[in-house]
Each structure stands twice: as structure tokens, then as C-alpha cells.
């Protein structure tokens, strides 16, 4: 009879899978000389409350070790055909998804080519709660004496305890040939049935290759009959299938389980029986020396001391409703492996072929479906500790870097190089000292450092203190202190009590590391030149000079200072008085000439500046100035004859006429243009020459030039005035 396997939705003969798996496995020949050693080399013993059989599937891409699972010849005749029928109809295993073309859970044994072995195959069922015959198990028994020597017998049931220990003894073969270790099928997106299983693999010596086998354990009640043993196990299997199946989440990383280096007659893997009321808490006890779990995606390589077994993504230790405690007691160096994979195992690097990661044995937890999952508290604690340490390290490095940068800078202090300089007036020394002491050095240094910082932020090349750096402070002279809050003395922008203290540091520090600071106190209202104004001359001025001339001089005084340097640059400021574009030629110099006459008059006789001088000196100065003014005005008045002009010498026109005539723009131009310097005469020569007489030829040239250009301008101005008058009359009538 050809055994069948459930593949997809069809039943496929198992010979097809034999051919697939045999292509990926190595055929091994074992000498018959070592067959008699299996009684002296017990490998493992497992006891459990569960009565279910489960074998992890073998990987299709790995080396498959075929092993035979056969009952002993003593108990073989006791298995009835009815038991086989009941066992075939019992749904034991369940798988939801099967992506690989390999069969689910089956064992294969590699025998000699001349011998045939018993093949028992456990198949998956598609549905979990179905009661149909989902398991097809066929066994072809050919009793051969050589084959029976390789079969693993059952142990006798133990009547002293409440369970039957089924011991499977594996062979330990001494061979220098390469024997493939037992590997497991990889479960891809499958649900493992609720079974208690421990898959152990062992290797013997550095030159010994051992065959690993699965260890199954069933625990029925006390009985001497194997038939009743099998029937009770089938009933418990049906009850266990009614409970929800356990889910095994496959992880993305491959885990190689290192099998312990067993020596014959030294190790027994025991699991004592406990009360059913105990919790399901698997405890893994081992020596402090714990072997590592190398993580890699490559194939398991055979080492001198141990085998790397590549199981499915995890080797679960499942539990059913029956409560038990598994304890692995090891008296030697063993590998401490967790029961199930945690979710954090997918973070292991796939390139760590020779890398060893030490994984502790956490206390597993049971989820809702009853599956045992390893606790990931230790992993999360390690991850949290590593992240916390990294954050603390980065924070400390971040806090340390500004300190190192600040230490590179040379600490500097302030030092007043000289007494405070007062500009714009005179202030008592006591007030200046109080003002300087009211501002602390730390405040000045902080403000200068801020400016240095702003320069660095803008990317400027010179962050050091220099002449461009300065800090200004508002100072009240009445309070004699710096203003930190509003002061009652300061009202308005122009206040005589307000002053500004400027602190200007030197570019570099001296040898002592101190930066000298220059203090400058600038008054808001500097000393005005009110004494130079010609207001006292108003009373002593003759009638030939009109009052409107003085008003024009006052207006010019507001725009032009008294220094000679500013007088030289008056040509650049002549556009201020050019009212219309056609009047630029005429209005370039008159506004400055009025001021020059005034300066010349003051420089010729400085006694006229004082109002308390004698009347004779003032009258002589006024007569001399009036004569020069009259001579210049006669020339200019003769040259400027138009409808809009008026005679300066006429004293009958009071200031009322000036107010009415200044409303029109050309009239204002004529007020300022009655003084003219001849061509070729500089202003400085005119000012410093006391008895300067105008040459008759030079005014003629200017007169001829002015006569050529005047008619056009006069026509334009008359037309403009007429047009303005007509528009004014038009709007007035309406």
C-alpha cells in the first residue's frame, strides 16, 4: 500500500515526496557494528500529561535525516486492527496555511539500501474542528531481523507512577563519515497543533556524529495493555482538538539551535510530573555557563564538538489543558534556548554567521489560545537601557561641546582707558562719574557679547570687540544715572536732561587680557550758535535793507552751518532752493550769497556780534555793509527786470507785501536772487577780502548771459501764472 499525503487539496502519494526529499538529503550508510550500542546510550526521556504525538516538520531545503519510528516487536502483535482504524480516523494535527510543496509532519529513516523500513506519516488536516478522517497513516511492516535491530522499541509502562514513560533510544554511531544531523521542516505560516513536544538533538564527541531523533511522550492512565493505552490517547486527542489550537507566529530570522555535547551514559533529559493544578510555567534550569545561539541564514555546518540544527523558526514547547511544569536539569554545559521565539528575534542580523548572541531564558507567558510564548521583558529592558544610554551619551556630548567651544575663547574684562569724553556741552565731573558708575561692567560686557554673537550668526568675519562694536545707554543728567525705567525728567524727544553714553571697546585685548573701553557722553541738545544770529541788528538796520531779507537769512541759517568746511560744500546743496526746473540756472547761487554776505560782514568787524558795543561801531559796520549790499543790489536789479520783480530799495512795501508775494513761487525765488557773485570770483576770496569791489566787466557778462535766457523764462512764467489765474477764476465763479 502506498501512503498518501495531504498536499493542497489533493491526496498525493508519498513516493513523490520521497523523491523530492531524497534529492536534498545525503544517503548515509551505517555500519552494523555499532548497532548493539543503542541499549547503552540513552539520549533523553520526556514525561508529560499530554497524550498527543507531534513532530516538527522537516525543511525541504535542508538535509533530512530519516529515522524510523517503530513500536517494539513485543508490543506490535498487541495492536489490533480496530485500534488502527480508530487512530486513522482521529484528527490529531491541524495546519491552516502550507506554502511549501513539502509535506507537513513526517519522519523518515535512512536504512541500508538492501533493507526496507517502516514509514509512518502523520498528515495535516485542513479544518480544526472537523471529525472526519484527516489523518492518513499507513504502515508497511516487513519484519526483518536487520531492520528490527534498528527500530526503536517502546519502554515498558511504569506501574509505580501515574504515567507511562515512552523512551525512545537513539543510536550513537561512531563514524568518521559525515552524518547529517536531524533538521526540521520550516513551518511557513502554519499553526502547530496543541502538542507537547521536545525536539532534542545531540552530538557525541569531537569525532563522533550522532543521529538525533524526536522524543515523544504519552501519558495515559495505569494500564498493562497497550491497546487501552492507544484508545485513551485517542480520546484525549479528540478532547484536545475541541480547544482552540495554538498559533505559532513565524519570525523572519533563522535560529540555529546548538545541540549539547552529550557523552554516553551522562545526560538524561527529565521532566518530573507535577500536579495538574500547577500553573503552566516552563522553567529552564542550567549551569551558569550558557552556550550562545548563533544567528544566521546560512546552512548548519558540522563542527567538531556539536551540531547546528536548523529547525523551523522556533521549537515550541506546547501545553494543553493539562497543566504541567517542564524542568530541564542539566549538570553540565548546555545550551540555554528559549521555549518560543519572541517577536524581537526578527531584529537579529542575517549576516551574523559567526556571531554569537547570548539569549537568556525568560519566563514564558500563555496567550488566550494557550500557547506558550517567551517573555520579551529582558529584551525590551535591554533595548530600553541601550536607547537610554545612547540618549544620555548624546546629551552629555551635546552639553560638553559648547563648553569646549567656550573654553577656546579668551576671557576678557573691561577697563576704562581714559575719562569720559563729553560732546555737545559741559557736564560736571561728579555727574559724569555717577553716570559711569551706574552702569556695571557685567552689563556692558554682556551687551558686547550679544553683539559678537549676532555677528557670528550673520556670518561676519570679525566677531572680536572692535571699533564697530558699541553699546549705547540712555542717561538722565538730572538723575545722574542710567535709565533702567522711565524717568520723570525726560519728556519728549528733545530734552536737555537726556544724554547718551556710548561704550566703544578697543579691537584687541592688552597683555593682561583686558579690553580697554572708551566712554563718550553725548548730550541730546548741543550748544547752539544763537549768538551768531543777526536779531540784534534789526533795530539798527537802515530802511534800505528790507525785513524780508532778514527772514530769508534766518531760513538759510536753518539749513547751513557756520564752519568753513561746510561753506565749501554748499554747491552740493544748491538744489534745495531751486523751485522750478527753469529756475535752476538762476537759483544755483543766490541762497548761498546771502549767507556769504552775512559771514563776510561778521568776519570784517567781529565787534558787531555783541549787542552792547558802541553805536558808532555798529553804525559804521551797518553803513559799510549796506553800501556793499546796495551796490550789489543795484547791479542785480538792473539786470533782472520782469513783471514779477519788485524794487528792493522801495521801503514803502512793508512785510505784508512780502507775505502776499511769497505765496507765488517765482516771487520767493526773486527774494533770494538779488545777490550774485560775478563769474570767476570764489566765495572764500569774497569773504576774506575786506575791500572788494565788483569789476564792471564781469557783471556785464553775467548780464548778457542773463538777458539771453530771461525772455524765454519770463514768457514761461507769465504763461504759467496766467494759466493758474484763469483756472482760479474758473473755479471761483462756480
From Swiss-Prot:
Residues 608-654 are annotated as: Disordered. Keywords: Nucleus, Phosphoprotein. InterPro entries: CSNKA2IP. Residues 612-654 have a biased composition (Low complexity). It is found in: Nucleus. One of its GO terms (cellular component) is nucleus. Its main location: nucleus. Phosphorylated by CK2 (casein kinase II), specifically by complexes containing catalytic subunit CSNK2A2. The keyword Glycosyltransferase does not apply. May play a role in chromatin regulation of male germ cells. Interacts (via C-terminus) with CSNK2A2. This is Casein kinase II subunit alpha'-interacting protein. It comes from Homo sapiens.
Amino acid at each position: 500500500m502506498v501512503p498518501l499525503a495531504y498536499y493542497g487539496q489533493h491526496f498525493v502519494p508519498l513516493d513523490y515526496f520521497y523523491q523530492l526529499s531524497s534529492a536534498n538529503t545525503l544517503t548515509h550508510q551505517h555500519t552494523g557494528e555499532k548497532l548493539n550500542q543503542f541499549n547503552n546510550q540513552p539520549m533523553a526521556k520526556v514525561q508529560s500529561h499530554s497524550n498527543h504525538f507531534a513532530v516538527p516538520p522537516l525543511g525541504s531545503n535542508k538535509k533530512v535525516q530519516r529515522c524510523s519510528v517503530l513500536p517494539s516487536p513485543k508490543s506490535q502483535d498487541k495492536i489490533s486492527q480496530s485500534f488502527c482504524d480508530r487512530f486513522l480516523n482521529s484528527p490529531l494535527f491541524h495546519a491552516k496555511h502550507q506554502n511549501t510543496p513539502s509535506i507537513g509532519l513526517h519522519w523518515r529513516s535512512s536504512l541500508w539500501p538492501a533493507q526496507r523500513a517502516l514509514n509512518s506519516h502523520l498528515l495535516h488536516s485542513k479544518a480544526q474542528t472537523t471529525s472526519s478522517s484527516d489523518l492518513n497513516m499507513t504502515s508497511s511492516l516487513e519484519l526483518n531481523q536487520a531492520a528490527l535491530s534498528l527500530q526503536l522499541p517502546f519502554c515498558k509502562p511504569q506501574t509505580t507512577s501515574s504515567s507511562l514513560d515512552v523512551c525512545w533510544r537513539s543510536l550513537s554511531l561512531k563514524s568518521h563519515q559525515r552524518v547529517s544531523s536531524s533538521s526540521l521542516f520550516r513551518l511557513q505560516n502554519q499553526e502547530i497543533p496543541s502538542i507537547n513536544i521536545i525536539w532534542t538533538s545531540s552530538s557525541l564527541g569531537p569525532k563522533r556524529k550522532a543521529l538525533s531523533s524526536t522524543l515523544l511522550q504519552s501519558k495515559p492512565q495505569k494500564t498493562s495493555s497497550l491497546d487501552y493505552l492507544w484508545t485513551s490517547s485517542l480520546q484525549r486527542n479528540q478532547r484536545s482538538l475541541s480547544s482552540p489550537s495554538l498559533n505559532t507566529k513565524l519570525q523572519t530570522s533563522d535560529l540555529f539551535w546548538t545541540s549539547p555535547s552529550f557523552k554516553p551514559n551522562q545526560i538524561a533529559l527529565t521532566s518530573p510530573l507535577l500536579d495538574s493544578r500547577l500553573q503552566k510555567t516552563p522553567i529552564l534550569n542550567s549551569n551558569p555557563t550558557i552556550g550562545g545561539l548563533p544567528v544566521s541564514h546560512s546552512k548548519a555546518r558540522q563542527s567538531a564538538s556539536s551540531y547546528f540544527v536548523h529547525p523551523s523558526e522556533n521549537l515550541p514547547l506546547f501545553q494543553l489543558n493539562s497543566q504541567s511544569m517542564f524542568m530541564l536539569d542539566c549538570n553540565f554545559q548546555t545550551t540555554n534556548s528559549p521555549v518560543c521565539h519572541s517577536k524581537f528575534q526578527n531584529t537579529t542580523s542575517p549576516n551574523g554567521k559567526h556571531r554569537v548572541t547570548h539569549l537568556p531564558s525568560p519566563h514564558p507567558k500563555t496567550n488566550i489560545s494557550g500557547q506558550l510564548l517567551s517573555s520579551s521583558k529582558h529584551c525590551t529592558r535591554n533595548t530600553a537601557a541601550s536607547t537610554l544610554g545612547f540618549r544620555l551619551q548624546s546629551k552629555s556630548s551635546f552639553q560638553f561641546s559648547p563648553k569646549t567651544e567656550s573654553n577656546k575663547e579668551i576671557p576678557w574684562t573691561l577697563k576704562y582707558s581714559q575719562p569720559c569724553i563729553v560732546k555737545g556741552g559741559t557736564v560736571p565731573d561728579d555727574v559724569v562719574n555717577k553716570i559711569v558708575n551706574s552702569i556695571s561692567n557685567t552689563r556692558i560686557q554682556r551687551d558686547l557679547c550679544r553683539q559678537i554673537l549676532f555677528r557670528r550668526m550673520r556670518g561676519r568675519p570679525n566677531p572680536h570687540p572692535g571699533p564697530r562694536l558699541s553699546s549705547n545707554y540712555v542717561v538722565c543728567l538730572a538723575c545722574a544715572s542710567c535709565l533702567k525705567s522711565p524717568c520723570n525728567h525726560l519728556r519728549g524727544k528733545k530734552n536737555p536732561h537726556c544724554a547718551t553714553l556710548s561704550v566703544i571697546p578697543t579691537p584687541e585685548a592688552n597683555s593682561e587680557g583686558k579690553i580697554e573701553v572708551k566712554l563718550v557722553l553725548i548730550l541730546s541738545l548741543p550748544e547752539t550758535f544763537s549768538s551768531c544770529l543777526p536779531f540784534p541788528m534789526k533795530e539798527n538796520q537802515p530802511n534800505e535793507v528790507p525785513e524780508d531779507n532778514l527772514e530769508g537769512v534766518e531760513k538759510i541759517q536753518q539749513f547751513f552751518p557756520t564752519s568753513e568746511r561746510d561753506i565749501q560744500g554748499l554747491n552740493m546743496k544748491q538744489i534745495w532752493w531751486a523751485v522750478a526746473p527753469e529756475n535752476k540756472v538762476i537759483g544755483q547761487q543766490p541762497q548761498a550769497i546771502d549767507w556769504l554776505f552775512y559771514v563776510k560782514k561778521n568776519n570784517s568787524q567781529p565787534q558787531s556780534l555783541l549787542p552792547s558795543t558802541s553805536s558808532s561801531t555798529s553804525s559804521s559796520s551797518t553803513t559799510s555793509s549796506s553800501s556793499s549790499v546796495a551796490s550789489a543790489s543795484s547791479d542785480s536789479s538792473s539786470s533782472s527786470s520782469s513783471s514779477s520783480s519788485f524794487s528792493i530799495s522801495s521801503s514803502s512795501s512793508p512785510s505784508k507785501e512780502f507775505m502776499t508775494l511769497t505765496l507765488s513761487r517765482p516771487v520767493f525765488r526773486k527774494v533770494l536772487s538779488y545777490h550774485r557773485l560775478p563769474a570767476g570770483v570764489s566765495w572764500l576770496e569774497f569773504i576774506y577780502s575786506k575791500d572788494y569791489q565788483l569789476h564792471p566787466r564781469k557783471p556785464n557778462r553775467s548780464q548778457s548771459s542773463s538777458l539771453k535766457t530771461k525772455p524765454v523764462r519770463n514768457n514761461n512764467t507769465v504763461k504759467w501764472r496766467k494759466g493758474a489765474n484763469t483756472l482760479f477764476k474758473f473755479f471761483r465763479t462756480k
